[in-house]
């Protein structure tokens, strides 16, 4: 924003300081700061490593708190000192100092708005790595091709975001596209940023597979779940699962491995199926598949608890999973629109090249 006077600058600098302090208090960040101090002291105690499991948990919790608090620490002092800086500069330069302070105010305000969005990610799961699954709906080649387009869109987004990712399972489509894909995504607030992608993504375009060049509508479901810590107890009975092993193969039929190292686990009571084939070792693929199953079962338990709470409180909210969240229209006009936030853009090419951060941020603002 353009600041027009010294009086206005003094007012908005104090408002920014107050907003920061209010948000700090609302999010109980002082308590988190004390917890981080306590965990740091524990981590520095050499006797801690006599118990490797406790040491691992302390280190993990410390790292998670640092991820949450470091962005606030980075900007905290600048915002708290800004009103004093304004007073000193204006005393020295008068109205001539408004310009340089205005740009600094805009920088701090922008950083604070980013922090407010991170403040919406207050659940412990939001800090976790994520599993992202892409599954085409009915429609054969059309929807399978759309699934592969979304796979590319997400991997481009991860690259721009600086997230690490691995394609842990993929099934080639019939002639084009993919029948299924699962990604493991690691980065700050990976699940928190990606959880809003849960739902059905709709594509409208002139089909490249239709000789008559007719317009087709395709649907793909995206499911995101957090990776769950080992200390969270999710019981999986041997009698409830079926484990299948098979030979790995990549999208487009590309041969990946010559041994039956890929693992698929079916949890029969829930109907959940997970698979992993990116490792050469069957044991590693099995471990990853069990992590995915654990994440899905944990999520299922959370959903049941949420539904029970809504039932008791007399509330019933729309279920996001299974609902159409976003449309990507390539014909007769260019438009990508999120139906939850009404955020939209006509630059379809940029979105398909991974420019989905504005959609993700718009969704986080609704939380």
UniProtKB/Swiss-Prot annotation:
Q: Matching SUPFAM superfamilies, A to Z? A: Release factor
Concerning PTM, the database record says:
Methylated by PrmC. Methylation increases the termination efficiency of RF2.
Gene Ontology molecular function: translation release factor activity, codon specific
Q: What is its main location?
A: cytoplasm
Q: Does Signal appear among the keywords?
A: no
Cell location: Cytoplasm
Q: Which UniProt keywords apply?
A: Cytoplasm, Methylation, Protein biosynthesis
Residues the record lists as N5-methylglutamine modifications: 254
Q: Does the record bear Calcium in its keywords?
A: no
InterPro entries assigned to the protein according to its UniProt record, in alphabetical order = PCRF (IPR005139), Pep_chain_release_fac_I (IPR000352), Pep_chain_release_fac_I_sf (IPR045853), PrfB (IPR004374)
**Source species, domain of life:** Bacteria
Q: Which family does it belong to?
A: Belongs to the prokaryotic/mitochondrial release factor family.
Q: What does this protein do?
A: Peptide chain release factor 2 directs the termination of translation in response to the peptide chain termination codons UGA and UAA.
* The protein's name in its UniProt record: Peptide chain release factor 2
Q: Which organism is it from?
A: Leptospira interrogans serogroup Icterohaemorrhagiae serovar Lai (strain 56601)
